[in-house]
Amino acid sequence: MSVRILNWSNRRALAPIAVAIRSFKEQHPGADVAQVERPLSDFEHQGIEGVAAQYDIVIFDHPFCGRIAASGCFEPLETSLPDLLGDDRAALYIGPSLATYRYRTHVWGAPIDGATQNAAYRPDLLERVGGKVPRSHGDVLELGRRARHAGMWLGTALQTPHAFMSILSYMANMGQPVRADDDALLEIPRASFARAYQAMHDVMQLSPPEARGWNSIDLHEQMIARDDIVYTPAVYGYATYGEEDMRHRLGFAPFAGLEAPYHAGSTIGGTALGLSASASDRDMALAFIRHALQLGIVERRIGRHHGQAAARAEWDDQEIDRIFNGFQSGSYSSMETAWTRPRYPGYPEFQRKAGEAMASCLLAGADVAKAHGMLCDIAGLGVRAGAAR
């Protein structure tokens, strides 16, 4: 029997699992465990039922929990790993990392990676323009004007679904997020959407034209490769871009929202290990999931191998924070106050279409009414249903 793990292609994801596989094999001689990688774009829009039929363990993010529960393609984990994933185990993980995978009373994923939208910047360029790390959106615009005066830019990621993710973060920061239950999206508040859409437009206008094709990895890559992107206020953070082997080590800070507390409300990401209901060797797969979780919670080794664990123990580890140039300390407050996306079965498809629509609207200069109407149509809501109540 063998265990095949589906992962996504960045060293943040691959390196910690490779270490976990090696140490697992040392403890279980003869175990056949391997990982397969695929691009980030496939990860963000995966057909979860199909990959669950092909792999024993699938690394995924929480918006798929509704589809997973409805299809039965994964096995719930809370009864098999109660000491790591039980109702009283949330404090083992940063922010709502564990809660995001609890849907309809079951835990569908074991949190292995912790992330939310946070700010990132080039310390050398920030000093060059004479700016400070922004705390609020108003500060972001002031820094953006300084950057443009110096021939530099802010940065943003517009490729699906990242523009929409930033809009969701700004809305949640104002205390008026999109509203959903376990079955459907219920409301897209017009007032908070209008301000969030404008905030995203503001940042886009201060970003280079090429940003229209960037996802979160692209934005980090561009920030270390070129010398004219000073800062981004909202991107899914990659701690590895603060490591010493980068051409320019990035610095990290909390999400810069519209209202105080400015760091709060960013849209949580991260990933978890899901156990396929059709795993070829269930016991070995479950044993590997336990082993991988303990690598972060007990041994604190994920951050020492390019990863950013969901385990709180690693976020509190000063040496890991040093390795990543302050990533954990810089984004800690945003992780602790992050907002969780809806998880009803149809949400992943809504997110995909909404991401395409918001990127298109922003690039075309569409007004708030048109953009809001498009979102409500995609969600199957009338515009009145999407209005603030």
What residue ranges belong to the model's regions?
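Conserved N-terminal structural module of periplasmic/extracytoplasmic solute-binding proteins
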Residues: M1-C65, L381-R389
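A ligand-binding cleft/hinge motif common to bilobed small-molecule-binding domains
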Residues: P63-A69, A234-R249
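Hinge/lid segment of periplasmic solute-binding proteins
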Residues: C65-T116
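Extracytoplasmic/periplasmic solute-binding protein
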Residues: W108-A110, L141-L185, I229
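Glycine-centered hinge/linker elements that transmit conformational signals in sensory
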Residues: D182-G213
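Extracytoplasmic/periplasmic substrate-recognition and gating elements
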Residues: E243-G307
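Long, aromatic- and glycine/proline-rich binding clefts that accommodate carbohydrate-like moieties
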Residues: G303-K353
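Conserved C-terminal helix/tail region of periplasmic/extracytoplasmic solute-binding proteins
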Residues: S334-R389
